[in-house]
Amino acid sequence: MNLNMLHDNVLIEALEECNSSSPIQLPDSAKKKPTQGKVVAVGPGVYNHSGNILPMTIKVGDVVFYRQWAGNEIEFHDKKYIVMKESDIIAKEA
């Protein structure tokens, strides 16, 4: 991965749920967005009022859960990712 995240940004590869057994096909705009993903890149963190960096609690390889409408989708090397702030992540697998 040749993409360096800045500040407290996290790059996530969404883990899709496969529910193809239903005969009803919904348009993409009506489908529920994924809320689980694998972290592929993290920024260094943000600076506090004293000028010290607050390190990230999320690391590359973590499987995380995030808010449904969190982040922005980007495409990098023909693959889709979600970029979000660390604060949009609500849990990680232990």
Curated annotation (Swiss-Prot):
Heptamer of 7 subunits arranged in a ring. Interacts with the chaperonin GroEL. It is found in: Cytoplasm. Together with the chaperonin GroEL, plays an essential role in assisting protein folding. The GroEL-GroES system forms a nano-cage that allows encapsulation of the non-native substrate proteins and provides a physical environment optimized to promote and accelerate protein folding. GroES binds to the apical surface of the GroEL ring, thereby capping the opening of the GroEL channel. The keyword Membrane does not apply. SUPFAM superfamilies: GroES-like (SSF50129). This is Co-chaperonin GroES. Coiled coil: none annotated. Keywords: Chaperone, Cytoplasm. The keyword Nucleotidyltransferase does not apply. It comes from Ehrlichia chaffeensis (strain ATCC CRL-10679 / Arkansas). The gene is groES.
